[in-house]
Amino acid sequence: MEVTMYTDGAARGNPDGPGGYGVVLHYIDKSGTLHEKELSAGYKKTTNNRMELLAVIRGLEALNRPCQVTVYSDSKYVVDAFNQNWIGGWVKRGWKKSDKKPVKNVDMWKRLLEVMQPHEVRFVWVKGHDGHPQNERCDTLATTAADG
């Protein structure tokens, strides 16, 4: 099954302020019917990057069978980690960046890699706050969740 996933994360007073994530999942069933599911949640103390990662994690966790997933995100942090293969280098170096400093949010990156396992996932960057309807919806879900 092909799934399109739009994700966004938000944090107020980044770092360590309240934050939230938003996810919009789309898939078309065998009869040609479009299905949409929205996910969001807020947290008291977090960062924007953790919320960006959690959005993708929660979206993938919502899938009940192996899928071909296209993730649309305005987070260069998330998209470039895969499309520029930063993550491959981090894993090879024991979760250290090329400058030997530890990778931040290792717990979330490991969790993301784990939930990606049954799926074929590709990442596409979209410019945030640029009128893309699903990205705007994810932003609304994330900021509303962050505001509690």
Predicted features along the sequence, with ranges:
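RNase H-like nuclease fold core
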Residues: 1-50, 54, 58-67, 140-148
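RNase H catalytic domain
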Residues: 10-16, 57-137, 141, 146
